[in-house]
């Protein structure tokens, strides 16, 4: 057992300890609470339903956070890490007041953006190796979790019985090109006049002209992000319906053969 533990923490200490189709998030909430919430939802999700506050789905605002370093109250993204090690370091920093917390293992999907790839040199915290999930992470997308007690990660990965591999199999995070127009830089930010963002600037951003409706740069970014999120959600729903229909067809075929 000592040898197994030793090997586990050697792997944990390596920056390469990452799975290409898995992401990680440290969170103080236990799995049953996450399940009741429907998954790992952005803070702005609750604000929207409780107070009618519009979610801010601006990646640059999300990455910067607030001036005090905390998550924005209207944030429309959920932060994850590329590696277990990065998530553990984040947990030890922001959850140091908890004797027990969890690191959730999450399947990748196209509503997720590598912050450093999208924001490039303007990424405010590049060392965090963050991948942000637009609109949150459903419970069915959570592969499992590790329990962390007094800073030590439990060796056992607890599998989520409600994880649906067939929904997320072969899905990857969004390519950086999909995220450039959703970057969310302020209207006059120099990034909109530089490569690669200059070719993806929404109307009203940088040197791009205003929209016909007169929307500002921020409003246009919000609109584009909303459209992107809805298209992704529709894709997942179609996949769920397709799988359900396939199961019904199989059931009917077996019934007819009996």
Curated annotation (Swiss-Prot):
Binding site for NAD(+): 25-39
Disulfide bonds: 205-217
Claim: Nucleus is one of the keywords in the record: no
Source taxon at top rank: Bacteria
Active site: residue positions: 130
Result of changing residue 128 to S: Abolishes toxicity
Disulfide bond recorded as keyword: yes
Gene Ontology MF terms in the entry: toxin activity
Summary of subunit composition and partner proteins: Heterohexamer of one A chain and of five B chains.
Protein family: Belongs to the enterotoxin A family.
Function field: The biological activity of the toxin is produced by the A chain, which activates intracellular adenyl cyclase.
Name the record gives this protein: Heat-labile enterotoxin A chain
